[in-house]
Design a protein with these regions (language model features):
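Bacterial c-di-GMP phosphodiesterase EAL domain
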Residues: 1-81, 86-93, 287
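Amphipathic alpha-helical regulatory segments at dimerization interfaces
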Residues: 46-50, 100, 301-305
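Short, low-complexity, intrinsically disordered N-terminal peptides in bacterial proteins
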Residues: 1-8, 136, 151-152, 407-408
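The catalytic core of metal-dependent phosphodiesterases that act on cyclic dinucleotides
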Residues: 74-189, 314
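Conserved alpha-helical "signature site"
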Residues: 55, 142-408
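Generic structural hydrophobic/aromatic packing signal, biased to beta-strands
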Residues: 11, 28, 60, 82, ...
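Surface-exposed, flexible loop/turn segments at secondary-structure boundaries
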Residues: 66, 116, 137, 192, ...
Length: 408
């Protein structure tokens, strides 16, 4: 049996976020697992088989020169974006492959420091760039606008490009809102949450409204559960309410499904209506929530609960609420002890033990380009690298992106 290319690579990912704070694409990190040459054509065919027209655009970030050379040589026109590090262009072989790949119609992305942009003859080989702002650029970007009215404020941010390593909310907002950046990779979650520290976190207004509309349309119980699972804070608040003295249920509610069944749709809608006036409309929180949802989906896929739906839902919930401490600002153990959850969830999220810890730790590791950490987790938990990569690609291919309306 021919080994799949997914067994010879270590993959990781990072979301690309648009100016509307919606998912715009995925940066896919690809590391050679060994010194063996990776069949880049096989990798691209594997991705093509899993991807659909609605899947997010991909930016493939090869983490070795050899893998990049193979991608540049073998990728056909219409392949995902391929990243080329600026410093690697000093390698004459890579530069030659870049020029021929550009002539074949490949879409290439230059990655590097905004202060070291390529010369025009090199730059024309690239469709876009993934830029890092220098500290002095960040300071300049955040200077107040000119005092004289009518004087245009110039930005150091180049419009239409992508940016990475943006650690502050103010700089992210400058890039996306003022600098007209195409996207930012990753998200300044810590600073966004810090900027909101004086305001208790609330569930998403959009998710609450979506769930109310689904109830009005008499959609399925599975649909209600899926929508509620789009917001970790809404799911948590719902379960806290279900287990409160206000409802007086005789048995503890340990899952969203059970809570939906026990509470009844009219009562759920009344409860949602009570949440709506205080709900969050801050667009900067959308990437925070969606990142938690992707982590939950990955955790469930990695543990491959199969046909046991209750178990799959429990694993999803484990991944969804695993970072609630970041939203609520108190220890995760304290938060989870308010609910009669499965001990398996508490063990994985707080104690880092038990049957769910492998999937949860791997889902978190895959959010980075740390190949050593991913390899170590595969060894520790005896996880098959090919299956890990396949689970990752399946989850990523199912994500939805906001696309511009088709031209008439």
């Amino acid at each position: 049996m021919v080994q799949s290319v997914l067994g010879s690579l270590i993959l990781g990912y990072r979301p690309l976020w648009s100016p509307s704070r919606k998912l715009a694409g995925i940066q896919l990190f690809a590391h050679n697992e060994s010194s063996a040459v990776v069949d880049a054509g096989h990798l691209l065919r594997t991705i093509q088989e899993l991807w659909s027209a609605s899947s997010p655009p991909l930016l493939i970030s090869a983490q070795s020169r050899q893998l990049l050379l193979n991608l540049l040589e073998n990728a056909p026109k219409g392949s995902p974006w391929i990243e080329v590090r600026g410093e690697w262009l000093a390698d004459s072989e890579i530069y030659a492959r870049v020029k021929t790949a550009h002539q074949r119609g490949l879409r290439l992305v230059w990655r590097g420091d905004i202060g070291k942009l390529p010369e025009p003859d090199v730059a024309r080989c690239f469709d876009n760039s993934l830029l890092t702002l220098r500290p002095e650029d960040a300071v300049a970007a955040l200077q107040p606008p000119p005092a004289r009215p009518g004087t245009p404020a110039r930005s150091v941010v180049l419009a239409g490009q992508m940016y990475e390593n943006i650690e502050s909310r103010a700089l992210m907002e400058h890039c996306l809102d003022h600098g007209q950046a195409l996207a930012v990779t990753g998200w300044p979650t810590e600073d966004v949450l810090y900027s909101l520290r004086h305001h208790p976190q609330q569930p998403s207004h959009a998710v609450i409204f979506k769930l109310m509309k689904a109830i009005d349309a008499e959609q399925s119980l599975e649909t209600f559960e899926d929508i509620m699972g789009e917001d970790p804070l809404l799911a948590y608040r719902f379960m806290v309410y279900n287990n409160s003295a206000a409802l007086g249920l005789r048995t503890g509610i340990d899952s969203l499904r059970r809570g939906l069944v026990m509470m009844g749709y009219s009562s759920i809608k009344r409860w949602l209506s009570d949440q709506l006036p205080h709900a969050s409309t801050d667009p900067n929180m959308h990437p925070v929530r969606e990142s938690m949802v992707i982590r939950a989906q990955l955790t469930a896929h990695l543990l491959n609960a199969g046909v046991e739906n209750d178990l799959r839902r429990e694993i999803y919930l484990c991944g969804l609420i695993s970072r609630l401490d970041e939203l609520l600002g108190e220890p995760l153990g304290t938060i989870l002890r308010r609910l009669p959850l499965s001990e398996r969830i508490y063990d994985a999220t707080v104690l880092h033990t038990g049957p769910y810890t492998a999937g949860l730790q791997m889902a978190c590791a895959l959010e980075t380009d740390d190949a050593a950490a991913i390899r170590q987790l595969c060894e520790t938990f005896e996880m098959d690298l090919e299956e890990v990569n396949r689970a990752l690609l399946r989850v990523l291919s199912d994500l939805e992106v906001e696309r511009p309306p088709a031209k008439r």
